[in-house]
A protein has these predicted regions:
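Cytoplasmic C-terminal tails of single-pass
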Residues: 409-428
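Bacterial N-terminal signal peptides that target proteins for export
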Residues: 1-12
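Phosphate-group recognition and catalysis centered on beta-loop-alpha active-site segments
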Residues: 20-307
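Beta-rich interaction/scaffold domains
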Residues: 305-389, 400-408, 414
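Short, low-complexity interaction segments enriched in Ser/Thr/Pro/Gly
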Residues: 3, 377, 381, 417, ...
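Hydrophobic H-region at the start of alpha-helical membrane spans
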Residues: 12, 386-396
Length: 428
């Protein structure tokens, strides 16, 4: 590569780096962006906060959801229960004792299903994930509608146990024009999901859920629920080596729907920890929606991944537009091959490290471009003339070998004849 070209290439790299770094500041995608990404951007990593910011607020609380969004969550997973008078509230357990106390600080040993909404609103949520050791807070149990109104335009809720209350949830979302504000996780058979969705005039956004280790069952489940119209499939197993996590299994979902994994539950993540090391692992397997307890860290990891993807995409554009006319055949072919690999990486769900490594390899291929006049002296170009010359040389070697072999055989025959004549003369 000439000095001028090298300078232009270095300038292009600097521009790419500066522009990409401008997008590093953490922010949560808008609900519209998240829904669009679910449907149209299969490689974009989506961060789902499990029950909100439980490090600072009660799980399933409006305040915890809002805090998770501020920390970069694209979606927030919640669970719902129905009260005695039919209101849907955010709560993981039917029994209130783990998460609720009365005004005196006493745990409430009652179920949601036997308690009315007005009575529930008198109770207070315990901090974090609740339990005996957690203290009471000032925060209250919200209804699903209150939560939707509070986060309107800020995030998308993923209702984990939606199948249990699917009809009530659908009616509430439909009546309040909120079908695009929630994703319903349907843990049911493929036939049941297909049957339920087929009767809907307006289609909700749906994830299905499969837990198991048998590969043909998981692949069949993916295919059938994809055909039913789901936007994602949560694949889970307690076995780290389950074929459920195999790239070939996840590939059944890629390009059609999102592969979802819950890193907060060892029985669903194959006992993988909710850390960057294992985020690398699952994203390299094709998972692109991750449910996490570490919202801020995963959000930063997601931004790093998208930044690396943007940088590689921009460098691919530079490589595609590079004039190779005066470049050596060897270096030009090397760049073309590397560019093909880079585009394959961009079209797949891969980890941040893979994107960054591929950026380095493509940069190296670009920087290694050499002018034909200087490089072809060392890297011999394969041409028709050279191929013909090589063939003629090979034929020449074969002919020489044949002549030599004939000469050797004739010499052997003459020696044998000479020995016979010598023997006869000696006898006389």
């Amino acid at each position: 590569m000439t000095k001028v070209r090298k300078r232009l290439f270095l300038i292009a790299l600097c521009v790419i780096t500066v522009i990409s770094s401008l997008g590093l500041s953490a922010y949560a995608a808008s609900p519209e962006e998240t829904v669009s990404a679910l449907r149209n951007e299969p490689t974009k990593l989506i961060c789902v906060s499990k029950y909100g910011d439980t490090a600072h607020y009660p799980e399933n609380s409006i305040e915890g959801i809002a805090s998770a969004v501020q920390k970069g969550a694209d979606m927030v997973a919640v669970r719902v229960k129905a009260t005695a008078d039919g209101e849907l509230v955010l709560m993981s357990d039917d029994n209130l004792s783990r998460m609720c106390v009365d005004s005196q600080g006493n745990s409430i040993n009652k179920t949601v299903s036997e308690t009315g909404i007005y009575e529930l609103h008198e109770y207070f949520l315990k901090s974090g994930k609740g339990g005996v050791s957690q203290t009471a807070t000032e925060y209250k149990i919200p209804t699903l509608l209150e939560a939707l109104q509070a986060v309107d335009g800020k995030t998308v809720l993923l209702i984990e146990n939606a199948w249990e209350y699917k009809d009530e949830i659908y009616t509430l979302l439909s009546d309040n024009n909120r079908l695009n504000s929630c994703v319903l996780m349907l843990e049911a058979g493929k036939k049941e999901i297909s049957s339920w969705l087929s009767g809907k005039s307006a289609m909700p956004i749906v994830f299905s859920k499969f837990k198991g280790t048998v590969v043909w069952k998981s692949r069949s489940y993916i295919n059938r629920t994809v055909n039913a119209g789901v936007a994602g499939v949560l694949l889970g197993s307690s076995n780290a080596y389950s074929m459920t996590f195999n790239k070939n299994t996840v590939a059944k979902a890629q390009g059609k729907v999102r592969a979802v994994i819950d890193m907060t539950d060892p029985n669903l993540s194959g006992k993988r920890a909710d850390t960057q090391l294992y985020w690398d692992d699952v994203t390299s397997r094709g998972f692109s929606v991750i449910i996490t307890d570490n919202t801020e860290q995963l959000s930063e990891y997601s931004k790093r991944t998208e930044n690396a993807r943007a940088r590689l995409s921009e460098l691919c554009d530079v490589a595609s537009k590079t004039d190779l006319t005066l470049c050596s055949t060897y270096s030009a072919t090397n760049l073309k091959n590397r560019l093909t690999v880079s585009k394959d990486v961009l079209s797949s769900s891969v980890c941040a490290n893979a994107l960054e490594n591929e950026y380095y390899e493509l940069s190296k291929a670009l920087n290694s471009l050499n002018d034909r006049s200087t490089d072809d002296k060392n890297q011999k170009t394969v041409t028709k003339g050279r191929v013909v010359a090589a063939v003629l040389v090979a034929v020449g070697f074969v002919i020489v070998e044949i002549i030599f072999e004939r000469y050797r055989n004739e010499s052997i025959k003459l020696r044998k004849v000479g020995r016979k004549l010598y023997g006869k003369a000696k006898k006389k």
